[in-house]
Amino acid sequence: MEYKRPIGLDIDLETGVIPGAKKLVRRLSDLKGYFLDEEAYNELLKEDPVVYEVYAIEQEEKEGDLNFATTVLYPGKVGKEFFFTKGHFHAKPDRAEIYYGIKGKGGMLLQTPEGEAEWIPMGPGTVVYVPPYWAHRTVNTGNEPFIFLAIYPADAGHDYGSIKEKGFSKIVIEEDGEVKVVDNPRWKE
């Protein structure tokens, strides 16, 4: 039997970069229709800022293996809503995931298919377990990049379509200088 070789990589804890990783950049234009305040979205779209970057080390898409990635989620808001990742269910919904906060301040918004939502604040050292069947999105509630590590089954896949179509049942906003998790008026059951 030929065995896969182990690897060891250093993550730059200041920048979130994993040397040699596959890099994905998501700009505001990639998040059209995700934010509530369309007027604020269109105004900020003139600059089309980078909202987040992902540095992924991916394995062959097969059961039993693991992928890992860092995400650098930049600070910012569209209207009152903090910058966030697209969010997804797993294509194989019975797959779980682990997130680990490295730098900055934010949180994870999780949701069942029926819309039951949980908000878990995150900072350096916070570990979040995402159970099977829960959609998840990270949100930067701070003033610096929010950097975290994700570890997930190589065969989990991503279902972005369900979130694009229905959204999350809650949104994370700043109101009166505080982080608030409120009902999303556009959420569809």
Swiss-Prot record:
InterPro entries: G6P_isomerase_archaea/bacteria, G6P_isomerase_prok, GPI/OXD, RmlC-like_jellyroll, RmlC_Cupin_sf
Top-rank taxon, per record: Archaea
Major site of localization recorded for this protein: cytoplasm
Residues that bind Fe cation: 88, 90, 97, 136
Keyword set, alphabetical order: Cytoplasm, Gluconeogenesis, Glycolysis, Iron, Isomerase, Metal-binding
CDD domains recorded: cupin_PGI (cd02218)
Pathway: Carbohydrate degradation; glycolysis; D-glyceraldehyde 3-phosphate and glycerone phosphate from D-glucose: step 2/4
Oligomer status and interactors: Homodimer.
Protein name: Glucose-6-phosphate isomerase
Organism: Thermococcus kodakarensis (strain ATCC BAA-918 / JCM 12380 / KOD1)
Chain's gene name: pgiA
